[in-house]
């Protein structure tokens, strides 16, 4: 009987771990340069995270650091999880460009260019972030969430990055975190009503990676974001950074 009880408890613990509800807040487009300063929305979200005793992740566009703003860089350092803050900063490319080539084909920073070009952007961004902040990216998310097979090959040149958000389907070398529900109905516009509708319909029970552009949010969008976060907290969702989540699933 005792053995049966122990086995039952073990099964319950395994089930609990498998069904644990985890949310990752993926915020895009941090800039911290003299030409393109840090948007106030990132500071507001970090302050919210501190008040809520939780964490968020923010992607840095690194060409802005070619001419860094001292105050913005100091803010990154002070708020980084490595320094006791609430923000995981991740690699969001060098220049976040998209364009149409001479043949009329759409190109993105990490979809279209060859391996060498993409590798240079990855390495340059990694190097300048380390140089200006003393921190190292462990997580990558491509601009526009556009990446290709060349990106997969180029990523081998930045071995410090072990986690990829929204990768191509063929990616197998790094831990991957895929897209789930949406909190924005358009870039920079959060809708609690739309999210709540989708959330109720799909009834997610495992990890959710939720993308936003908080640097563009107005007061209404921020309030709707806070309502979404409150809803998930009430429903038992735990907030982690991408690295914390990868570590957690790696132990199972």
Task: Identify the role of each PLM range.
Residues 3-12:
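Sec-dependent N-terminal signal peptides
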Residues 22, 69, 75, 139-142, ...:
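Active-site-adjacent pocket scaffolds in enzyme catalytic domains
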Residues 41-57:
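Catalytic domains of carbohydrate-active enzymes, especially glycoside hydrolases
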Residues 55-149, 206-210:
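Metal-dependent polysaccharide deacetylase catalytic core of the NodB/CE4 family, i.e.
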Residues 162-166, 214-252:
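C-terminal domain-boundary segment and adjacent tail
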């Amino acid at each position: 009987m005792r053995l049966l009880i122990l086995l039952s408890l073990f099964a319950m613990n395994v089930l609990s771990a498998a069904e644990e509800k985890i949310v990752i807040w993926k915020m895009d487009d941090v800039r911290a340069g003299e030409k393109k300063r840090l948007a106030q929305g990132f500071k507001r979200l970090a302050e919210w995270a501190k008040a809520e005793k939780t964490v968020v992740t923010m992607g840095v566009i690194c060409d802005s650091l070619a001419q860094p703003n001292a105050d913005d860089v100091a803010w990154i350092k002070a708020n980084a999880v490595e320094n006791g803050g609430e923000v995981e900063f991740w690699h969001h490319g060098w220049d976040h460009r998209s364009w149409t080539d001479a043949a009329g084909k759409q190109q993105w920073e990490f979809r279209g260019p060859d391996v060498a070009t993409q590798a240079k952007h990855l390495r340059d961004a990694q190097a300048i972030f380390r140089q200006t902040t003393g921190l190292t990216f462990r997580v990558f998310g491509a601009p526009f969430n556009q990446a290709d097979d060349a990106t997969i090959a180029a990523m081998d040149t930045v071995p410090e990055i072990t986690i990829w958000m929204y990768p191509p389907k063929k990616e197998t070398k790094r831990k991957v975190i895929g897209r789930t529900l949406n909190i924005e109905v358009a870039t920079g516009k959060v809708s609690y009503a739309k999210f709540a509708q989708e959330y109720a319909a799909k009834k997610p029970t495992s990890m959710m990676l939720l993308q936003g552009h908080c640097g563009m949010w107005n007061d209404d969008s921020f309030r709707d974001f806070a309502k979404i976060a409150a809803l998930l907290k009430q429903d038992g969702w735990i907030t982690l950074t991408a690295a914390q989540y990868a570590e957690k699933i790696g132990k199972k």
